[in-house]
Amino acid sequence: MQQLNPSEISEIIKSRIAKLDTSTEARNEGTVVSVSDGIVRIHGLADVMFGEMIEFEGGIYGMALNLEQDSVGAVVLGDYLGLAEGQKVRCTGRILEVPTGPEMLGRVVDALGNPIDGKGPIEAKQTDAVEKVAPGVIWRREVNEPVQTGYKSIDAMVPIGRGQRELIIGDRQIGKTAVAVDAIINQKDSGIKCVYVAIGQKQSTIANVVRKLEEHGAMENTIIVAASASDPASMQFLAPFAGCTMGEYFRDRGEDALIVYDDLTKQAWAYRQISLLLRRPPGREAYPGDVFYLHSRLLERAAKVNEDYVEKFTNGEVKGKTGSLTALPIIETQGGDVSAFVPTNVISITDGQIFLETDLFNSGIRPAMNAGVSVSRVGGAAQTKIVKKLGGGIRLALAQYRELAAFAQFASDLDDSTREQLEHGQAVTELMKQKQYSPMSVAEMGVVLYAANEGYLKGMEVEKIGAFEAALLDYMNSEKKALMDKINEKGDYNGEIEAEIKESLDQFKATQTW
């Protein structure tokens, strides 16, 4: 047996000691005190920051929302059923981030950016913070480019510009989502990237939206962020912020994006649930005091930013380009009550609203937009020339019709001018009807609006107006394609184009093909 030299033994021990890793990792740990309804109370975590990600045992994450004297209130991001009292929790030193970039287009993800469409992982090259400060006043530009929804009634009377926030408000089941989805479908050739955020909806409804976007070739241009009714309140609360971050990726690089929040009422409900479980003091309708700030900080991130902002953000890589993020938030009212807390909040934050009415919907007028109450505060500057010039007469005709129709119910004999106005208003109301998934081009809108303004519908039976419009558009797209292409190119309207439209309408009316 070999004898070991004591000096050799000491050398081996010394070398082992020299190689020993004695570095220490400071970890701020706490202990779970209670778990209930997705809310966790934690003892410890003295250095945790507001909004910081915290990690539970088993790789589950949470977000610190209440920082109290001797405990922390956190919301669990995901399934909380595996958490138990006494488990360890640690700080991560990070705030919540989601993957962003063009790799997200065409995919359906949850509020944390994880794919849920079964198409495999997303190879996103970067992540961005979910909560961001909106661009300051100095970086913003005026809204001066249009977002065409494809609905003639909206584009003519309530125009939407790139960088605007336009609220879609109304009771349940009257076509709010239909308007927003059609607006997304209409962007498939416009270069505008789209984000659709589904909050608290049935999974079957979300699947139907995905299917319709795929059918119309718009899905490859769209990101869908889904927090369904079966997801925790924390995910429904975070989904709009995650979707906004994904849309901002394009805005900050000199591109245009459109985001639909469907709907913010359910986000407010989720936030109310979280706040009450965190024992925050309730205010009006049991909402917490900062529910206005919840929506204002989200919607202020939709903006049109100037060339300097884009150049600074991209470190000089993109020059001379403006970027925009246009928001279409949806709010669901109860019994048409727009004076409730959340609707009044969002109306005051946005740049206008499209008000959909149950009575109009039930009487067959779709989209069921009330033209008298609906308004766009900044979109007029962004309208195409032809729609702006010809759309003014439509709003006036509908306003006069609504006023006269109320009096006509009580009057037995009407003079000729009043009867003409009533008939014209009826014809225009019928003309403003439009089927879902059938968006119109600028040229098609221009021709239809010109026909309404210049008396081409006069004396026509209301039942035949739909057939007249369909036949007119078929004729214009086949026989007058050069004129339609010229209008679509720039949306201009001048004496020459007016004369060509008039000549085309006269020729069509002579054919009597409807």
Swiss-Prot record:
UniProt KW Transcription keyword: no
Sites binding ATP sit at: 170-177
Tell me where it resides.
Answer: Cell inner membrane
Its Gene Ontology molecular function terms? ADP binding; ATP binding; proton-transporting ATP synthase activity, rotational mechanism
Q: What is its EC number?
A: 7.1.2.2
Q: Main localisation, per the record?
A: membrane
Q: Which superkingdom, per the lineage?
A: Bacteria
Any Gene Ontology CC annotation: plasma membrane
**How does the record classify its membrane topology?**
Peripheral membrane protein
- Where does the record place the site Required for activity? 374
Answer yes or no on keyword Repeat.
Answer: no
Q: Which Pfam families match?
A: ATP-synt_ab, ATP-synt_ab_C, ATP-synt_ab_N
Catalytic activity as recorded in UniProt: ATP + H2O + 4 H(+)(in) = ADP + phosphate + 5 H(+)(out)
Q: How does it assemble?
A: F-type ATPases have 2 components, CF(1) - the catalytic core - and CF(0) - the membrane proton channel. CF(1) has five subunits: alpha(3), beta(3), gamma(1), delta(1), epsilon(1). CF(0) has three main subunits: a(1), b(2) and c(9-12). The alpha and beta chains form an alternating ring which encloses part of the gamma chain. CF(1) is attached to CF(0) by a central stalk formed by the gamma and epsilon chains, while a peripheral stalk is formed by the delta and b chains.
Q: Which family does it belong to?
A: Belongs to the ATPase alpha/beta chains family.
Q: What does this protein do?
A: Produces ATP from ADP in the presence of a proton gradient across the membrane. The alpha chain is a regulatory subunit.
NCBIfam families in the record, alphabetically?
A: atpA, PRK13343.1
Record's protein name: ATP synthase subunit alpha
Q: Which organism is it from?
A: Alcanivorax borkumensis (strain ATCC 700651 / DSM 11573 / NCIMB 13689 / SK2)
